[in-house]
């Protein structure tokens, strides 16, 4: 995922957490906020309490990033995906499905924004 398509700084995440629309599922929580970049920007959060080891945490983050890459999000949105406990043992297919369903719910709630 290109650098321009990622949320990188703390204030970018803070804005999405404070003002974004929350879409919760059993595996992930999406926070979606319109942006002015002209393309989607993604952020991923996997907590240390959820996955204590760095290897497992980064593995889950990579899997979420790939699921997001394969999901269609064509509009200008900041999207933060936060892993939930069920995501640890979920298959990649389940993670991809959860991301896709979350984005389609976001599109409906934003009036066709994703």
Task: For each feature predicted by the language model, list its residue ranges.
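Positively charged, solvent-exposed patches that mediate nucleic-acid binding
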Residues: 1-114
